[in-house]
């Protein structure tokens, strides 16, 4: 493996550690002053190994910051009505401040209807239409965790956003669209590319800030990026037991000023942001 310049790597684990330390201190204060322990319930439907792993990682993070965490592990063949009932019971519980619906759900279930059923005040992932609408008018509270984590990383590394050209490759509700809104809220000029964009390279070569979230291994090559750009790689592809991002990291890092690795980049900050959300929701009940 060729040597890479470590000063160019955006260390997601270090940022996550800092965020978790802030959350832990605030959780301890909330317990001490108000007697409230923030609680997160993760709804996991079926036996998908990746989903199980993600829930485990989130539970471990809860343990590190003092948040109570539990699983609602539901069978693969659960009906939509039963899922909505499970969500409704969590909405009513006073000890649960954050609800997380681990996606994807089995194909027979309606994901959007299930997400819409979560109390917006307990929407730990920030996917509820109410919270998405708040984001569009510039109110950033419970917003999708990955874009929020990327904004935190930009701030931590002192990257100027205002007046910069930010390009997002991928237009999902989880990353692309909310990322665009958050960057616009900070006065960036934003371009969104997707599978129907005719010449993606034309956009990526002009990006001061590039966020890539497609799940296509090494989609972004060295000749597609601007000298001195800042790049966030959100994609994950598993192949022969190895994990790859959407960005050809080892070559792109030669040209960029900052790049996130995969793993160890965006992922840890996303989970730390989730912890922030559970804390925020608990603080509002105090």
Swiss-Prot record:
Reaction catalyzed: (6R)-5,10-methylene-5,6,7,8-tetrahydrofolate + NADP(+) = (6R)-5,10-methenyltetrahydrofolate + NADPH; (6R)-5,10-methenyltetrahydrofolate + H2O = (6R)-10-formyltetrahydrofolate + H(+)
Listed GO MF terms: methenyltetrahydrofolate cyclohydrolase activity; methylenetetrahydrofolate dehydrogenase (NADP+) activity
Domain of life, source organism: Archaea
Residue stretches in coiled coil: none
InterPro entries: Aminoacid_DH-like_N_sf (IPR046346), NAD(P)-bd_dom_sf (IPR036291), THF_DH/CycHdrlase (IPR000672), THF_DH/CycHdrlase_cat_dom (IPR020630), THF_DH/CycHdrlase_NAD-bd_dom (IPR020631)
Family per similarity comment: Belongs to the tetrahydrofolate dehydrogenase/cyclohydrolase family.
Function noted in UniProt: Catalyzes the oxidation of 5,10-methylenetetrahydrofolate to 5,10-methenyltetrahydrofolate and then the hydrolysis of 5,10-methenyltetrahydrofolate to 10-formyltetrahydrofolate.
Protein name stated in the entry: Bifunctional protein FolD
